[in-house]
Design a protein with these regions (language model features):
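Acidic beta-strand-to-loop metal/phosphate-binding motif
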Residues: 137, 194-206, 229
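TOPRIM metal-binding catalytic domain and adjacent DNA-binding surface shared by DnaG-type primases
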Residues: 2-84, 88-91, 127-130, 219, ...
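Short, aromatic/basic amphipathic alpha-helical patches
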Residues: 209-221
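A short acidic (Asp/Glu
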Residues: 146-150, 175-176, 208-212, 238-240
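A generic structural motif
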Residues: 166-168, 224-234
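A residue-level signal for conserved active-site and pocket-lining positions in enzyme catalytic cores
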Residues: 41, 92, 199, 237
Length: 272
């Protein structure tokens, strides 16, 4: 008799977290617009599904309104021609956002809204990591998106691994779970099932020092930590191919004091 292979369900990349947005964003379009994205995102290999997953918006002309603490006047901070990147806490509540210039002509590539909390208090995409066993720690939002794309393509990792971002190469906070900071967020994730952390920060020589000290702090929370390296100095996950990211993921080395020492001497070679 003829056996029929079961029809493969097509898996769609989508977040299951209900988002709340008390933060008023500058005037914007939700993405995608009629299935399309600004060229800037297309060039960075961001698909419409990814743009939706990360709740990206497009501000053509818009201002962030804030009260100047010195004059008590309401002012407007211009976010024209920027991709708005909302930042959520672990409960999916929007706390702040970033605006990434897409023209290449702006004085500042990233703009941060005045009078809102610093993004460095939060783990970017942390709300999608709640309940996952493993997180990949990246620096910037586009690094997180690059890793998400790679992991989503890898069926064995898809449901268990989530990338998160620290907005730079240091972790905020101390060992207090109630505090609104990054280490507190790691403790909360641990309480919700997080077991493994893979560090995928930039691999320049100075950067490895920062990576190791962050790895040490996370390991001290009782979490398994591995250190990954993309293999090329200065390459970050936002610019790497999915193959490079997965290779780095599988090749990551468990953090030990010895590895930290070796990295001080040999730099990136210690991680390859």
């Amino acid at each position: 008799s003829q056996g029929w292979a079961p029809k493969k369900e097509e898996v769609v990349l989508a977040s299951k977290v209900e988002l709340e947005g008390p933060v008023a964003l500058p005037r914007h379009y939700e993405l995608p617009i009629d299935g399309r994205l600004p060229d800037y995102l297309v060039e960075r290999h961001i698909s419409p599904d990814l743009a939706k997953y990360f709740d990206l918006r497009y501000c053509v002309e818009g201002k962030h309104a804030y009260v100047d603490p010195y004059t008590d006047q309401v002012k407007g901070q211009v976010f024209d021609m920027r991709i708005l990147i909302p930042v959520y806490d672990l409960d999916g509540v929007m706390k702040t956002f970033q605006g990434r210039d897409i023209t290449g002509a702006a004085e500042r590539r990233y703009l941060f809204p005045m009078q809102l909390p610093a993004s460095g208090k939060f783990l970017y995409n942390g709300h999608n990591a709640v309940g996952k066993q493993t997180v990949v720690v990246c620096e910037g939002a586009f690094d997180v998106m690059g890793v998400k794309r790679a992991i989503f393509d890898e069926e064995t990792l898809r449901d268990y691994v989530e990338p998160i971002g620290t907005f730079g190469m240091h972790l905020s906070g101390n060992m207090n779970e109630d505090a609104e900071d990054q280490l507190g967020a790691f403790l909360t994730l641990k309480a919700r099932g997080l077991r493994n952390v893979i560090m995928m920060w930039d691999s320049e020589k100075q950067a490895i020092r920062n990576t190791m000290s962050a790895a040490r702090r996370i390991a001290s929370l009782g979490i398994n930590v591995k250190v990954a390296c993309l293999g090329e100095e200065g390459l970050d996950p936002g610019d790497a191919t999915p193959e490079q990211i997965l290779k780095a993921y599988y090749r990551a080395k468990p953090y030990t004091k010895q590895l930290e020492l070796l990295a001080k001497i040999k730099g990136i070679a210690a991680l390859l």
